[in-house]
Amino acid sequence: TLALRCACRASICGSCGMKVNGDAKLVCKTRVDDIAPNGEQLVIEPMGNQHVVRDLVVSLDTFFSQIKRVDPFLQPDHVPEQGEYIASDDSMENLLTSMNCIMCGCCVSDCTVLEVDANFIGPAALAKAWRFTEDPRDSKRDERLKVLNDEAGGIWDCTRCLKCVEVCPKGVAPMD
């Protein structure tokens, strides 16, 4: 038997991430005709930079540990007296792309820095950090930026190869 993950078949859950001919992809939205139109050989592998559990299944423990390093939740300085804490559309516009992340790990799989430095926070965590540092409702912007700037494995360890941007199935462009 062959072990693999899949769930939605609509590229919204991110569970089916794998390497196809060396690049991370969501296989539920990857058509063989697009990759091998003339019947070329396909190589399907588990995602990179993550521990292989079995066959094409990888452990996401490291992935989520990287995400946790950026405190991935909104931390406002006060709670509104009534209703929701609403931000204007204009103030949230620059976050729309990062909010599309489905946490599939394709960017982490193909990150060239993570191949040589397991301490690097990784592109998914950096995209998640961007989502909260730029949210006008969040009060921890300076603290988040300090962690990203000062800690070993932070943002300055990125080599800007932009492989994460190239493989992101949702166009999040974590390092663009």
Question: Language-model segments: which ranges?
Answer:
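A basic, amphipathic helix-loop patch mediating RNA/tRNA/ribosome contacts
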Residues: 1-21
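Short active-site-adjacent helix-start/loop capping segments
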Residues: 11, 15-17, 27, 37, ...
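Glycine-rich phosphate/adenylate-binding loop and adjacent beta-alpha elements
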Residues: 20-37, 42-44
